[in-house]
A protein has these predicted regions:
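Class I S-adenosyl-L-methionine-dependent methyltransferase catalytic core
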Residues: 1-48, 54-170
Length: 170
């Protein structure tokens, strides 16, 4: 459940969703935070949830959002995407997302943003697949921690383990 979405991937998905479903005037909510409770969020007619929920309670979240009439577009595990006995719709992509914790998960999306009058229940999107693949190929900037002079982290000290024996004081 600790699969946090890389910002570049989230931004690509959010832009695609806003453009595809004409959501420019909607407030985007991200209620799934560590230690948070998504049910305590304030959902209004002009809000839409675009987020990556905990996959362990994914089906429960879908059922709650449908019951509460919350607009949503949720990241979901592709292998267990479908939620039976719901009016949920799906966007299927051919992409594996590498999440912040290093997990690589074949991902698709569950939504209720597709107009029921359209009769469409599933969208298969090469466009969204390509956008996600493109941003994942871009080198990600890694924040470098500047340590004070004379301080070391364990990764720096590992280099010495292969070349000799050392004992450090302090």
């Amino acid at each position: 459940d600790d699969c946090y979405t890389p910002p570049a991937v989230y931004d690509a998905v959010k832009k695609w969703v806003i453009d595809r479903f004409t959501l420019q005037d909607f407030k985007i909510l991200r209620p799934f935070k560590p230690g948070g409770d998504y049910l305590t969020e304030t959902y209004t007619a002009d809000t839409v949830v675009i987020d990556n929920p905990p996959f362990s309670i994914y089906r429960q979240i879908i059922r709650n959002y449908l019951r509460l009439n919350v607009k949503f577009f949720l990241f979901a595990p592709a292998l267990t995407l479908f939620v039976p006995d719901t009016m949920c719709q799906y966007v299927i992509i051919n992409s594996v997302i590498k999440y912040e914790n290093g997990a690589k998960v074949r991902t698709s999306f569950a939504t209720n943003l597709i107009s029921p009058e359209s009769g469409i229940n599933i969208i298969i999107s090469k466009d969204l697949s390509d956008k996600i693949k493109k941003v994942q190929k871009q080198p990600q900037k890694v924040a470098k921690t500047q340590l004070p002079r004379g301080w070391f982290n364990s990764a720096q000290l590992l280099k010495f383990a292969g070349i000799g024996n050392y004992e450090l004081e302090g």
